[in-house]
Amino acid sequence: PRSTPLYSSAASDVYKRQGDNRAADLGLVGNIGMNFQLMTQEIEDRDVPVDVSRYRDQLREREQQLDNARRDQMDSEEVPIDPLRLCREIASCVSDDMIVIGDGGDIVAQASKVIQVPRNGTWMDPGPLGTLGVGMPFALAAQKAHPDKRVLIVYGDGSFGLNGFEFDTAVRFGLPIVGIVGNDAAWGQMMRPQEMLYGEDRLVAVELNRTRYDLVVEALGGHGEHVVAPGEIAPAITRAFESGKPALVNVEIRQDRTGMKGSTYV
């Protein structure tokens, strides 16, 4: 829109530039969180009616449409495994006592569409900057802070390579964290733009191997599972948690070279 009733800016040095990009009836300069807290309190104090049901219902309808469009992938028996089928199987194993951590690019984008975490504060990921490698550090802290909960990491194979050896730390401290690697043998989010711009003969440092990361974790003293068929996923995850050890489930998934299938970022 060309005009908005209200916007909030996070930095005071933009005071003189209010309205440069977007016209406003009222510009507020200050901390975004504090501003919204004050506005919320003002709405309550003035008893202003707020009804977001129409907007919420529109979002729910769009979400359902996207879920229906992805259903064939989520039910796929394809081998290598469809990434969304992997995510569906993971979702079936998520319980109320679980903290889920996403550490990857494509696989986390897919997982976030399918996995329903039980409550606020039970999902963590690299955030908007995509700082890969946070999976095991987040998991170590989460498991130590909440020893009564189960902690699950959803990894891309590339991101596992950054801090995967911290499974050694989990073994030494007896923290039964379970990781699941969506292994497509690629840095997918870098591979596709390279191929699109330069062709498949000019890919640089984006192709990986179908490495047996599960054997790495076993060598460190943990439990490993290697999965190549959709029906094997959920039983492998169950065995991983039941092992009582830090564990890794290494799942071979389809590599989408020309575009991540089902990749609507909504």
What spans do the regions from the language model cover?
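Short, solvent-exposed loop/helix junctions and linker helices
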Residues: P5, E78-L84, R210, V227
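Short, hydrophobic alpha-helical segments
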Residues: I43-D47, F241
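Thiamine diphosphate
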Residues: G19-V29, G33-M39, A109-Q110, V114-V266
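Flexible, glycine/charged-enriched surface loops at secondary-structure junctions
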Residues: D47-R62, L248
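Single conserved hydrophobic/aromatic residue that forms the stacking wall/gate
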Residues: P1-A11, Y15
